[in-house]
C-alpha cells in the first residue's frame, strides 16, 4: 500500500535560477493543502456528534450505546494516530492525507445507510482508524517546507484548522437538513459531509505538494544548512530510505528521551483539556446552577478563545522566545493553574465564564507548541513517527485520565477530587515541559557545534 502512496523523487529538476521562486510558491500551496485537508477531517468526524439526537430518536439507541460509539471512535483514533502517523513517514504526504479523507467519506456513506447498532459501531471504529491519516502528513509537510524559525507561526495557522473545521460542520449539516428534510437525517448527517470531504480530498491532491525532493527541488536541509539537527543514534549512517517505518520509529522516536518528554507533555495537556471540556456542561449546570443558555455561552467561549491565542502564541514563540517553545507553554500552564482555582471557587456567573474562557484560551497553546516542538527534536523523516507516539499517548492515556479518572474522582471524593486531579496534571505538565526544553537546548548546542565544525573544515580546506 505504501508503495502505491509513495511518489518518489521527481525526475524533473527545477532549474537553479527558478528554485527560490518555485520553493516559495510551492510551500504556500503545501501549507494551504494540509490546512484544508485537516479541516475536512473534522467535517467527517464531528458530524457524528450532531447526529446523536437522531440516533436516539430514530434508531432507539440508548445513551449508553451512544456513549459507547463515541468511546470507540476516540480509542480507535488514538491508536490510529500512533500507527498511521508512523506509516506516513514512508508515503507521499498529500496522497496519504487525501486517501484517508476518501476512506472516511466511504465510511460515512456506510453510516448513512446503516440502522443496526453493531454495524454503526464497526463503521465508527473504521472512521476513527482512517481519521488518524490526517495529522501525520500535516506535520511532515510543515517540517519539509518550513525552517525552524517560522514553524511557530506556520504551526499556529495550521492548528486553527480544527477549530474552523469543527465550526463549519453545523452549518453544512444544517443546510443539508433544510434542503433534504429531517426524514432524510442520515443523508444530511453523513452522506452530505462525505461528499464535501471528497471535494476537499481532490483539492489536497491538486493543490498539495510532496516533499521538496519529490517536487524537483533541493531538500530544506540543503537550502538551509542550519536546519540540520545532530542526533546521537546508533544508526545515523544508515540511509532513511532503506529503513522501514518500524526501524525509523524504533531508532529515532522510541529511543529518544526528548520524544517521550514531549509525548508526556501532551498526555497531561489532554488530561486537563478533556477534563474541562467533558465535564464543563454538567459542572456548570449542577454545581454553578447555570442555565442551558448560559452554559452554552461558556462552552462557546472555551472553544473559540483558542483561535486568537494560538496565533499569538505562534508569533511569540518565534519572535520573543527565538524558536524555544516550552517556556511559553510553562507560562500558560501556570496561568491555567490559577484560572482553574478561580473557575472552581468563584460564585460569580461572569467570573466563572471568564475563568472558563481563559482556560480555553490557554490550554490549546501548550498543545500546539508541543506539536511544533515535535518537529524540532527528530529528523524530518521521523516526524510522522514522533507525532504518532504523541497522538497515541495523548488520546489513550491523556483523554482517559481527563474523562474516566476525573469521573471516578468526582464519584469517590466529590468535585474537589476532580479538580485536585487536574491541578496535579498541570504540575506534571510543567515538569515535562521543563525536561523537554532542556533536551531541546542540548540538541541546539549539538547543531551549533556541528555547524562550527563544518565551518572549520571548510576554512581548513580553503587554506
Model-derived features with residue positions:
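Cytoplasmic helix-loop-helix junction between adjacent transmembrane helices
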Residues: 123-161
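Helix-to-loop junctions at the C-terminal end of transmembrane segments
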Residues: 80-92, 310-322, 410
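Glycine-rich segments within core transmembrane alpha-helices of 12-TM secondary carriers
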Residues: 153-171, 393-402
Amino acid at each position: 500500500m505504501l508503495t502505491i502512496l509513495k511518489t518518489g523523487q521527481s525526475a524533473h529538476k527545477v532549474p537553479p535560477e527558478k528554485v527560490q521562486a518555485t520553493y516559495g510558491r510551492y510551500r504556500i500551496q503545501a501549507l494551504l493543502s494540509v490546512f484544508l485537508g485537516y479541516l475536512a477531517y473534522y467535517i467527517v468526524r464531528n458530524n457524528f456528534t450532531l447526529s446523536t439526537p437522531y440516533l436516539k430518536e430514530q434508531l432507539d439507541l440508548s445513551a449508553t450505546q451512544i456513549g459507547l460509539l463515541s468511546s470507540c471512535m476516540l480509542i480507535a483514533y488514538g491508536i490510529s494516530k500512533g500507527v498511521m502517523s508512523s506509516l506516513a513517514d514512508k508515503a507521499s504526504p498529500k496522497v496519504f492525507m487525501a486517501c484517508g479523507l476518501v476512506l472516511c467519506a466511504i465510511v460515512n456513506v456506510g453510516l448513512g445507510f446503516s440502522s443496526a447498532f453493531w454495524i454503526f459501531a464497526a463503521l465508527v471504529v473504521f472512521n476513527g482508524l482512517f481519521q488518524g491519516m490526517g495529522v501525520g502528513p500535516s506535520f511532515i509537510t510543515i517540517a519539509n517546507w518550513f525552517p525552524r524559525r517560522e514553524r511557530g507561526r506556520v504551526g499556529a495557522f495550521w492548528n486553527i484548522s480544527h477549530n474552523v473545521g469543527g465550526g463549519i460542520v453545523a452549518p453544512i449539516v444544517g443546510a443539508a437538513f433544510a434542503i433534504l428534510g429531517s426524514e432524510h437525517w442520515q443523508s444530511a448527517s453523513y452522506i452530505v459531509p462525505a461528499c464535501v470531504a471528497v471535494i476537499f480530498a481532490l483539492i489536497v491532491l491538486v493543490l498539495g505538494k510532496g516533499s521538496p525532493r519529490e517536487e524537483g527541488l533541493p531538500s530544506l536541509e540543503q537550502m538551509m544548512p542550519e536546519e540540520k539537527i545532530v542526533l546521537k543514534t546508533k544508526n545515523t549512517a544508515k540511509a532513511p530510505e532503506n529503513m522501514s517505518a518500524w526501524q525509523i520509529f524504533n531508532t529515532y522516536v522510541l529511543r529518544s528521551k526528548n520524544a517521550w518528554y514531549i509525548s508526556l507533555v501532551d498526555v497531561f495537556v489532554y488530561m486537563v483539556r478533556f477534563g474541562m471540556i467533558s465535564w464543563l456542561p454538567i459542572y456548570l449546570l449542577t454545581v454553578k446552577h447555570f442555565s442551558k443558555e448560559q452554559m452554552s455561552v461558556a462552552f462557546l467561549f472555551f472553544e473559540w478563545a483558542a483561535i486568537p491565542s494560538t496565533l499569538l502564541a505562534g508569533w511569540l514563540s518565534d519572535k520573543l522566545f527565538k524558536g524555544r517553545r516550552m517556556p511559553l507553554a510553562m507560562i500558560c500552564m501556570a496561568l491555567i493553574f490559577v484560572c482553574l482555582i478561580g473557575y472552581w471557587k468563584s460564585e460569580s456567573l461572569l467570573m466563572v465564564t471568564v475563568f472558563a474562557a481563559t482556560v480555553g484560551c490557554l490550554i490549546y497553546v501548550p498543545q500546539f507548541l508541543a506539536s511544533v516542538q515535535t518537529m524540532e527534536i527528530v529528523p524530518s523523516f521521523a516526524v510522522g513517527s514522533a507525532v504518532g507516539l504523541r497522538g497515541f499517548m495523548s488520546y489513550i492515556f491523556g483523554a482517559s485520565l481527563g474523562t474516566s479518572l476525573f469521573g471516578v474522582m468526582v464519584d469517590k471524593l466529590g468535585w474537589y477530587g476532580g479538580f485536585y486531579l487536574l491541578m496535579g496534571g498541570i504540575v506534571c505538565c510543567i515538569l515535562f515541559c521543563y525536561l523537554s526544553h532542556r533536551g531541546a537546548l542540548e540538541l541546539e548546542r549539538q547543531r551549533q557545534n556541528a555547524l562550527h565544525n563544518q565551518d572549520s573544515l571548510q576554512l581548513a580546506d580553503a587554506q
